[in-house]
From Swiss-Prot:
This is Polyribonucleotide nucleotidyltransferase. Involved in mRNA degradation. Catalyzes the phosphorolysis of single-stranded polyribonucleotides processively in the 3'- to 5'-direction. It is found in: Cytoplasm. It comes from Neorickettsia sennetsu (strain ATCC VR-367 / Miyayama) (Ehrlichia sennetsu). CDD domains: KH-I_DDX43_DDX53, RNase_PH_PNPase_2. Residues 732-751 have a biased composition (Polar residues). Belongs to the polyribonucleotide nucleotidyltransferase family.
Length: 757
């Protein structure tokens, strides 16, 4: 029989409950955590030791796979789509998976050979104000401890919301703003950070981190006591170690490695070529002893870390010869791709990002439906990293977790400076193509995106730039590195990405390779990042300091305004007939969102305003600048188009109406194109205005033939010779006058003629 253990406590005003021994009992470890009505089951499985002990083909890193699965039933919903079943992980699930993975990975022994799987399954999400990652991380940490895997936990996740002096923990706010920060921490240090802010200061971030550590404190003893109560926990897993091989590798290549790193080679390619030759020679030297290449490389990399640490901590010199705070050379090219709405090429050292901005309409927004609810995203940022960026060959696959995570981080940074929909009603898509990579490509994406936005003419308030900070520590001494390269990321102890404006931080992400970092070290890293960020911003502002005054000709024209809720149905029409008709006639895209905002997009300004006029007509909106037409009254107009079935006439308020061929004269019109030409002035009466805004006109103004849409109180009067009498045009005097010039009404007439100019 399995023994069921459970325990509860109050944390930040909500009940925290943990249970094990009831479900998933064949796994290495399992824990079910409920926090504030949100329930997550975490299950840990481990590759069998017999298989792991023989595995020497890949020792490049911890073989850990973490998945966060959000089931629709947890939200009380049935999945959308034809099959009504959950498929591949959504973007939201991928991001949650990365959060848990990044928090636990540095606490598992890196030389563990066994493959480890962690599955966090969201079973219930009754309280939508609780971030699911909080119980997921607690459950995963507890399951790892219960499994017996060499894990230096527990690790606790805390969600901090700071707005001025007000601090809230583990409570999702309805409104955006302030500083929102998710922290994974041990009892003494910070392991992982994910944050976005409205230009927060470095000290505000430090204070929020301190609040997170303070909030998590009572949970550590609670989890530790719970794990101790389970008596079946036994150490499992195979830890790779080979002291004999370690010494052989040191003897074979230590001096050569030191020589390469002491050369301070700035070129990544040259440095890697020399290192590659050392790897090859060492493999050849030790292959006769029966060692696999992965085993030899495992100890070579450990030796490289020692050498780099020594150089940085003792001499303050980095592998490429830079000082600790030095930023790599930066070059910028704007309007890089002709024909696009906006583009920029940002290069920093060996890292290069080509960012392209594209503008679209409301129809182009992405509909999201996940654990955060259904919503529409009007700002998209897609990060693409193909093998050629690092000079490698490989299969081209769909965007992976890394690409999704980097894209979301850059999106957080960019959104902080974007205007609201009322100012800029476009859907915006940014695509970052990483064409070269030597570290910090996500921060290059932030810089390139800001430049591309200004090149497009998007009215962003200011530039935003990003920088990646690194850390080298031996447990006693530590050094913070600015603008880390790929080698420094791999051989170092921290990857701390900070994005912001001149006024403050807007996004940050921190990952550790050691078991946490102190608040004091984070403060030093943030202050050093500020200096680097200001340097990068200066370079960007030198190229373009403010957005272009207007969008490019290739960009679509969009108008957004709100209409009354009661007239939405008039604009849409029966079965969408009205709105489709306006769209078809004007070649404009028209949408109305759930908040009654009308979005009109067209290729030209003329088509845009024509569509707006038609929408206003359909809604019955009154505008002092756009006079309203009245059925039964006379207006001066000009023919803008002659077609087989009639004349299209533009009226004084710029709206167009149709004079059907049967409404031109009581006599038969044999050749309409011979008798009427574009630009010819005519007098028309409003016969009817349809619900879709279409205007029916008549030139038979001497007859009492007003349409059913209204009636005329005017007596049946003649207004001079009819324009078509005896086959001749008798309106030569009228045609010679300007479009806005008309003589007074004919004698005895009580019908008014409207002038709007």
């Amino acid at each position: 029989m399995f023994e069921i253990k459970e325990s509860s406590m109050e944390w930040e005003g909500k009940s925290l409950h943990i249970k094990t021994g009831e479900v998933a009992r064949q796994a290495a470890g399992a824990a079910c955590v409920s926090y504030g009505g949100t329930v997550v089951l975490a299950v840990v499985t481990l590759q069998k030791d017999t298989a792991a002990s023989k595995k020497t083909s890949d020792l490049s890193g911890l073989a850990l796979v973490t998945n966060f699965l959000a089931k629709s039933y947890a939200l009380g919903r049935i999945p959308n789509g034809f099959f009504k079943r959950e498929g591949k992980l959504s973007e939201r699930e991928v991001l949650a998976s990365r959060v848990v993975d990044r928090a636990v990975r540095p606490l598992i022994e890196e030389n563990l050979v066994n493959e480890v799987n962690i599955v966090c399954k969201l079973l219930a999400h009754g309280n939508r104000k609780v971030l699911p990652e909080i119980p997921a991380l607690i459950a995963a940490s507890a399951a790892l401890q219960l499994s017996g895997i060499p894990f230096s936990g527990p690790v606790i996740g805390v969600d901090v919301d700071m707005r001025g002096s007000e601090v809230t923990c583990n409570e999702i706010r309805e409104t955006e703003g302030g500083l929102e920060l998710f922290v994974a921490c041990t009892e003494e240090s910070v392991v992982m950070v994910e944050a976005e802010a409205s230009e927060a200061s470095e000290e505000e971030v430090v204070n929020a981190l301190s609040e997170a550590l303070k909030s998590a404190k009572p949970v550590f003893s609670f989890i530790n006591e719970f794990v101790k109560s389970v008596t079946t926990v036994k150490p499992i897993g195979v830890l790779y170690d080979n002291k004999e091989l370690c010494e052989k590798v040191r003897a074979a290549c230590s001096g050569q490695l030191e020589s390469v790193y002491n050369e301070r080679i700035s070129s990544k390619e040259k440095r890697h070529n020399k290192l590659g030759q050392i790897y090859t020679d060492t493999f050849a030297q030790l292959s006769d002893d029966g060692y696999a290449e992965s085993e030899v490389l495992f100890f070579i990399k450990k030796l490289e870390k020692e050498i780099v640490r020594k150089n940085v901590l003792e001499e303050g010199i980095r592998p490429d010869g830079r000082s600790l705070t030095e930023i790599r050379p930066i070059s910028i090219a704007l309007d890089y791709l002709p024909g696009t709405h906006g583009s920029a090429l940002f290069t920093r050292g060996g890292t290069q990002s080509l960012v392209v901005a594209t503008l679209g309409s409301y129809q182009d927004e992405q509909v999201m439906d996940d654990i955060d609810g259904e919503r529409r995203e009007s700002v998209l940022l897609h990060y693409n990293f193909l093998p050629y960026a690092v000079g490698e060959v490989g299969a081209l696959r769909a965007p992976g977790r890394r690409e999704i995570g980097h894209g979301r981080l850059a999106l957080k940074a960019v959104k902080a400076v974007l205007p609201g929909k009322e100012v800029f009603p476009y859907t915006l898509r940014l695509v970052s193509e990483i064409t070269e990579s030597d570290g910090s490509s996500s921060m290059a994406t932030v810089c390139g995106s800001s430049l591309a936005l200004m090149d497009t003419g998007v009215p962003i308030t200011k530039h935003v730039a990003g920088i990646a900070m690194g850390l080298i520590t031996d447990g006693v001494r530590s050094a913070v590195l600015s603008d880390i390269s790929g080698d420094e990321d791999m051989l170092g102890d921290m990857d701390f990405k900070v994005a912001g404006t001149r006024n403050g931080i807007v996004a940050l992400q921190m990952d550790m390779k050691v078991r946490g970092i102190s608040i004091a070290t984070i403060r030093d890293a943030l202050n050093q990042a500020l200096a680097g960020r200001l340097h990068i911003l200066e370079k960007m502002e030198h190229v373009i300091a403010k957005p272009r005054e207007s969008l490019k000709d290739s960009a679509p024209k969009i108008l957004c305004y709100k209409i009354d809720k009661d007239v939405v149905h008039k604009v849409i029409g029966s079965g969408g007939k009205t709105i489709r008709g306006i769209s078809s006639d004007t070649s404009a895209k028209i949408d109305i969102d759930q908040n009654n905002y009308v979005y009109i997009m067209a290729d030209t300004e003329e088509a845009l305003m024509e569509a707006k006029t038609r929408v206003d007509m359909a809604s019955g909106a009154s505008d002092s600048n756009v006079p309203q037409l009245k059925i039964g009254e006379l207006y001066d107009g000009k023919i803008v188009s002659v077609v087989d079935f009639g004349l299209f006439v533009v009226l004084p308020n710029k709206q167009e109406g149709l004079v059907h061929i049967s409404e031109i004269s009581k006599n038969r019109v044999n050749d309409i194109r011979a008798d009427y030409t574009e630009g010819q002035a005519v007098t028309v009466r409003i016969k009817d205005i349809g619900s879709d805004g279409k205007i029916k006109l008549t030139m038979r103004i001497d007859e009492d033939r007003v349409g059913s849409g209204g009636s005329s109180s005017s007596p049946k009067k003649r207004f001079g010779a009819h324009p078509r009498k005896n086959g001749k045009d008798n309106r030569s005097n009228n045609s010679e006058r300007g479009f806005n010039e008309r003589s007074g009404s004919a004698e005895g007439s009580s019908i008014s003629r409207k002038r709007f100019f």
